UniProtKB/Swiss-Prot annotation:
The lineage of its organism: Bacteria, Pseudomonadati, Pseudomonadota, Gammaproteobacteria, Pseudomonadales. It comes from Pseudomonas aeruginosa (strain UCBPP-PA14). GO terms for molecular function: undecaprenyl-diphosphatase activity. Signal peptide: none annotated. Bacitracin is thought to be involved in the inhibition of peptidoglycan synthesis by sequestering undecaprenyl diphosphate, thereby reducing the pool of lipid carrier available. This is Undecaprenyl-diphosphatase.
Length: 277
């Protein structure tokens, strides 16, 4: 493995790890950075699956205590049963719409204008959600009802539109539906586990012919890097929201959306590769 290839894998692993669970759209960042460092082609599809899987495994590791507790208590404890049911309920809408419309959305909406508009609109909605008067009825994830879970699951479906951000959609949805920042953020992380693992398994099977033994070192660099930086991002976000709102992320989304429009308008980024990400 050449040093430049290793460097590319490292950089993209950092980008994936830092942006996957922040409400700022990891897809848009990956497209721009991949173009800047010249990383593309069929290997990029397989590589993206690997680093996304690493990011979600970082969340699994970070919340391993809660996961173990739920699994242990599932046969007998009502709270664990309700939490699991809420995850399944929230996961279901994305499964249905993903099966029905994923390819169609990827074909028609994966373009710089859609990504940029989704970022800007999402940023504006996030600002509004933060500034409106909060009536919190679920301080912790264990306080959520099945109706909360279903509404957040429907909100997650908006993330099928490129640039929306899965974490952004679920966190904003949680805030609008009466969850505290902590509960909305943590449930977003938990919901990411089945959602992203399912997406990775589906994509891995779809592109199974692209996984080659000679690419293993590149995948390993990206995997480890994404795992480490995803863990850093998750811990930092949980600490950040304890004393701050999501306004900073909202303004960043708006600025980033305008940047994407500029890169497209002035042909600074090869957005023809967007559909490959």
């Amino acid at each position: 493995m050449e040093w430049w290839t290793a460097f590319q894998a490292f950089i993209l692993g950092v980008v994936e790890g830092l942006t996957e669970f922040l409400p700022i759209s990891s897809t848009g960042h990956q497209i721009i950075v991949a173009d800047l460092i010249g990383f593309g082609g069929e290997r990029a599809k397989a590589f993206n699956i690997i680093i996304q899987l690493a990011a979600i495994l970082a969340v699994v590791w970070e919340f391993r205590g809660k996961i173990f507790q739920v699994v242990r208590d599932l046969p007998s404890q009502r709270q664990a049963q309700r939490f699991t049911a809420n995850l399944l309920i929230a996961f279901f809408p994305a499964v249905v719409l993903g099966v029905l419309f994923a390819d169609l959305i990827h074909e028609w909406l994966f373009n710089p204008i859609t990504v940029a508009l989704a970022l800007v609109v999402g940023g504006v909605v996030m600002l509004w959600a933060e500034r409106r008067k909060h009536v919190i009825h679920a301080e912790h994830v264990d306080d959520m009802t099945w109706k909360d879970a279903l509404k957040i699951g429907c909100a997650q479906c908006l993330a099928m539109v490129p640039g929306t951000s899965r974490s952004g959609a679920t966190i904003i949805g949680g805030l609008l539906f009466g969850l505290s920042r902590k509960a909305a953020t943590e449930f977003s992380f938990f919901l990411a586990m089945p959602t992203m693992v399912g997406a990775a398994v589906y994509s891995g099977y779809k592109y199974r012919d692209l996984f080659r033994p000679e690419d293993l070192p590149v995948f390993a660099v990206g995997f480890v890097t994404s795992f480490v930086f995803a863990m850093v991002a998750v811990r930092a976000l949980l600490k950040f929201i304890g004393n701050h709102s999501y306004a900073a992320f909202a303004w960043y989304r708006i600025a980033f959306g305008l940047l994407i429009l500029a890169t497209w308008q002035f042909h600074l980024i090869d957005w023809s590769t967007a559909g490959e990400m």
